[in-house]
Amino acid sequence: MKILGLNGSPRKNGNSMKLLESAINGAKDAGAETEIIHLYSMNFKGCRSCFACKRKSPMYGKGCAMKDDFTGVMESLLAADAWIFSTPIYNGHMSSSMSALLERFYFSHNSYDAHEKMVDREYPSLLIYNMNGNQNFLDKMGIENSCKYDVFLMESGFGKSQYFIANSTIQFDDYSKYHTAAVPIDAKMKLSSEQFPQDLQHVYNLGKNLLS
C-alpha cells in the first residue's frame, strides 16, 4: 500500500513539511510505502474553466485535460492508495499551490451526470493545515469551516477524509531579524515549544492509522 504526501508550502523544511513528515513516518511505521511531492517545485496553475473534463468526448473521466506538471501529480495521486496533504494557511485559506492542485483534481473528477464518484475505488485522505495564529483567532475567523468544506469535497469525490489544524506555529527562527513588534514573542515561543511536539505526535498517529 502506498501513501502519497503533498507539501503545499514554498518551504521544504518549514512547519507544513515537519507535520507532513511526521504523518508520513506514521504511515511508514504502519508498513506503507510513501512518497512526498513538493508542489512549489512544480509548474502548474489552477483551473482554466475550459470544461474539457465535462465534454462528451473520449477524455471524459480521465481527469484534467490541461497538460503541465499537474498531469504527473494527478497520475501519482491515482496510483497511490491514500493521500496526505499539508499546507500553511495564508489569509484564511490553504496556499495557492495547494488550492490550484485540489480545484483541478476535484473538479475534473466531479460528475455532473450523477452524485457519484468518478474514481473506481476509495482514496482515504488526511488534510493537515497550520497557521501562526492561535486558537482564539482561528475560532474568531471561522477558518475551520473552510477546512471542513475541503473535507466535504474530498469525501464527495474520493473517499473518507479528515483534517487537523496546528495553530500558534513559529514563522521565523529568529524574530529579532523581522518587524514583529506586535507579536508577543516570548509567550508565542513558549506555547509553540509545548504544543507543536504534541501536534507532530497527533499527525503521526493519524498517518499511522490512515489505511486502517
PLM-predicted stretches and their roles:
Residues 157, 176-185:
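The feature marks non-catalytic terminal segments
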